[in-house]
C-alpha cells in the first residue's frame, strides 16, 4: 500500500523541513510515501480560500486513494488505533492512503465530502507546519507498532 501526505502551503521553517525529511525517510523503510504540497490561497474570503485550496488538493489526490482528513473536529485515535487503521487498510487491499492537512481555514465542504475518515491529532490547535511533523511521526510510530518494533512504549 502506498501512502501520500498532502498539505497546503510551503514548509517555511528549516527545522520543520528537517523533521519532515527525517520521518518521511523512516516511513519509506516500510512503504512508498509521497509528499505533495498545494499552493496556499491568499487575499480572499475564508470560504473562497477553502474552495480554491480544496480544488488544488483534489488535483494531487489519486483516484484510487482513500482520503483521510486531519481536522480538530475529527475522531481522536490513539497511536495503536492509528496503527490498526493503517494495517486494516493495507490488509483490506486499499491501494493508497492519502492524509490531507488543510490550510489556515481548514477544508471546504466539497473536499470534506470526499473523505473516508476525519481524524484529529489533538483538541489543541497546532500550526499547520508542526502538524506535518506530528502526522509523519505518528505514521512512522504506527508502522513500528504493526511490526512489533520497540519504538512505541
Curated annotation (Swiss-Prot):
The EC number(s) this enzyme carries:
2.1.1.177
List, alphabetically, the CDD domains matched: RlmH-like
Superkingdom of source = Bacteria
MF annotations from Gene Ontology? rRNA (pseudouridine-N3-)-methyltransferase activity
Q: Which residues bind S-adenosyl-L-methionine?
A: 70, 102, 121-126
Which keywords annotate this record? Answer: Cytoplasm, Methyltransferase, rRNA processing, S-adenosyl-L-methionine, Transferase
Q: What is this protein called?
A: Ribosomal RNA large subunit methyltransferase H
Gene behind the chain: rlmH
